[in-house]
């Protein structure tokens, strides 16, 4: 691959990137993870694209990962009868009993408990907050009467946000359960859950994965509701990664509060040593233009400097005119800023004496020693991928080279900052294995004569136990 960036790029699949040639060009330009958006997914189409990506991985030695993104409990209005414009002061009834074409006076809502959950005075937001209504009354069964506060075109199937309402929807809808089972069958590398409000939401998905998969599939919690922000500490203990989903979050909370929430969530994720993805509207103008705005360039750069593991593109790659060029531009921005000394890493050392304490401590010191001796790379042998997460979290200047015989984590770890993975299944004595992976790193041009290299391994190596050994080598 032509890029040596450490921050990863997640690109959403869609009609704009449906050919093998475009997917290959996107990987070459810097895509590390492809996202399947199950809000707009046809199973046969998704399976075909996943097969194409895995075919490219096999043929060219790529490690592109697949992220399945579940829609979650998304509220929507029904189909409108005609072009409807609502004006401030208009009165409109939302009904849940019957899905009839909508008019200026009455519109269907796909959420049966809506009349029971809302209260007078609460807001209803439509179409990413473009329209705002205030609840006047509810009959608690099938109808809610609301007044238009902010008007405009009321369009079919547009999303609904209820920022002041505690919704009683399940975290996993029936559609999500079907989509998750399909994603598990496709052996996706990561599953993201939308609108996570509590740790219990994640436990439901964990139980579903355990029931249908022989392997653990790591879960990313998408934070896009105020409750998710409030409960972030308990959510972090039950997920494997975070996504700051700024689209719905910027509707559910005032948009001007999102920048500080983003920084807070990134800091929490880094402190917990789990990966974090920044998503939504990063290069939005590049859907139709070859040039991003200065504000978009700054947004990508600032997200990298906040410490994001990955930045994500949605419409830019799924339906945009320039799916390859937007990746090239994003890679350019990342490479320009990610080595900045202004990027801060939380220096909280492992304190709690868990059974992973030794591994955590060795990974921390490997990263710090690599910076001190200006090592070119940190090589680790891993079966679970745990050491890769831990080393990456300390953001060493050295490359993180992961050698594993576990084919599932070859692609899974491609989301993690700074990590490059290689298949390796010749585990002999510790000394011989370390010499062997160092030779491979040299052959691949990742280190050269005179470079310092740090190796992490478990002794005895055949047991594939927890890392307990750190060795420094000068490449000869």
Predicted feature locations:
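Non-catalytic helical/linker scaffolds that mediate oligomerization, partner binding
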Residues: 1-476
């Amino acid at each position: 691959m032509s890029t040596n960036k450490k921050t990863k790029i997640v690109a959403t699949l869609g009609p704009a990137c449906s050919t093998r040639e475009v997917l290959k060009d996107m990987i070459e330009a810097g895509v590390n993870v492809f996202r399947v958006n199950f809000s707009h997914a046809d199973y046969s189409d998704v399976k075909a694209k996943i097969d194409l990506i895995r075919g490219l991985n096999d043929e060219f030695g790529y490690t592109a990962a697949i992220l399945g993104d579940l829609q979650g409990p998304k509220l929507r209005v029904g189909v409108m009868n005609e072009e409807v414009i609502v004006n401030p002061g208009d009165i409109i009834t939302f009904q849940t009993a019957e899905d009839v074409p909508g008019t200026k006076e009455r519109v269907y809502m796909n959420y049966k408990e809506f009349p029971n959950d809302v209260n007078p005075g609460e807001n209803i937001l439509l179409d990413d907050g473009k329209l705002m209504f205030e609840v006047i009354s509810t009959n608690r069964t099938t109808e809610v009467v609301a007044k238009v506060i902010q008007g405009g075109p009321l369009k079919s199937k547009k999303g609904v946000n209820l920022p002041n309402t505690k919704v009683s929807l399940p975290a996993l809808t029936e559609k999500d359960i079907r989509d998750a089972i399909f994603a598990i069958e496709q052996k996706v590398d990561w599953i993201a859950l939308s609108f996570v409000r509590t740790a219990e939401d994640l436990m439901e998905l964990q139980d579903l994965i355990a029931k249908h998969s022989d392997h653990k599939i790591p879960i990313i919690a998408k934070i896009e509701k105020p409750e998710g922000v409030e409960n972030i500490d308990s959510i972090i203990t039950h997920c494997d990664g975070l996504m700051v989903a700024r689209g719905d979050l910027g509707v559910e909370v005032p948009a001007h509060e999102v920048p500080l929430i983003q920084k807070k969530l990134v800091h929490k994720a880094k402190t917990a040593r789990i990966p974090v993805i920044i998503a939504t509207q990063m290069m939005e103008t590049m859907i139709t233009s070859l040039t991003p705005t200065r504000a978009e360039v700054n947004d990508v750069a600032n997200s990298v400097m906040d410490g994001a593991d990955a930045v994500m593109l949605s419409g830019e790659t799924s339906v945009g005119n320039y799916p390859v060029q937007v990746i090239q531009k994003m890679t350019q921005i990342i490479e320009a800023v990610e080595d900045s000394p202004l990027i801060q890493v939380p220096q909280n050392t492992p304190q709690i004496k868990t059974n992973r304490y030794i591994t955590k401590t060795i990974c921390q010191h490997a990263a710090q020693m690599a910076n001190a001796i200006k090592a070119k790379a940190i090589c680790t042998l891993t079966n679970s991928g745990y050491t890769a997460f831990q080393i990456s979290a300390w953001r060493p200047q050295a490359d993180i080279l992961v050698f594993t015989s576990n084919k599932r984590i070859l692609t899974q770890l491609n989301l993690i900052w700074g990590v490059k993975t290689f298949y390796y299944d010749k585990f002999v004595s510790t000394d011989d294995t370390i010499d062997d992976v160092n030779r491979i790193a040299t052959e691949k041009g990742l280190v050269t004569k005179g470079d310092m290299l740090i190796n992490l391994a478990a002794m005895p190596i055949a047991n594939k136990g927890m890392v307990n050994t750190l060795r420094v080598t000068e490449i000869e």
